[in-house]
């Protein structure tokens, strides 16, 4: 879905007309790309065409409108997570843990993230505890979603941590019991749950928590109307994201933060995204450290 080289990024939009968004030298444009540039899985879904006239400062209002997060810090955090997820896999991304009680719209939130970052024909999938099934999903997806997770075993937790930092795993070849094949795992991961499912310290250190508010009766709408409203704004959201990425890629200013979370490269990218969105470095660091504390207590 995403190709990066130096300060240049290409995001694959549409396989029917071979179009992509190219970001370089602070500019975004839609252009044709050669067939061989991307490997396209059968589950690939074309992205809507972004409105590249939408500026970065318009991103936060759109996120505030469409994501039912608890407070303004979470509006900032989920915006940073979305933009960073579209910067490619040349650094490690946190697991996005979406948590909230019943009726808070967790699945809809995850669907929206997938539609922005890496839309698929299958949509989001229910969680399975089968390791081989999870390995297959992680090896096939840029953004891998697990919906309605109630428990994560130690083995699966370790597997998810490995996928965050990049690793290899083995699975049996089809129709054989003895032959193995090696698969590479490096994926951005989104998970929804009612209660905290990140129990191991390694997974906590590699995650960011997004807390959702329970919807009031007056706020409850049909999923069809919610998603229709979101799809209407999706070209504008994408335009704001791509222009934010253009600012991030052209930012050569050094990050001042002396202390960083475990995913230090992500922390630096978060600060650069914050700069483009008009948010001070210290504010971004405070949000990340507070989120780590909230996650350890959840």
Protein language model features and the residues they cover:
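Short hydrophobic-aromatic micro-motifs
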Residues: 11-13, 144-146, 190-192
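N-terminal nucleic-acid engagement/recognition segments and initiation subdomains in replication
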Residues: 1-54, 136, 243, 247, ...
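Conserved RecA-like P-loop NTPase ATPase core
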Residues: 82, 107, 113, 147, ...
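Short glycine-rich, low-complexity/disordered patches
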Residues: 1-6, 73-74, 79, 254-258
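P-loop NTPase catalytic core of nucleic-acid-dependent motor ATPases
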Residues: 27-140
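Conserved, well-folded catalytic cores of nucleic-acid-processing
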Residues: 62, 66, 85, 116, ...
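Catalytic acidic motif of RecA-like/P-loop NTPases
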Residues: 150-151, 161, 165
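Feature primarily recognizes SF3-like P-loop helicase cores of small DNA viruses
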Residues: 91-94, 119-126, 131-144, 152-157, ...
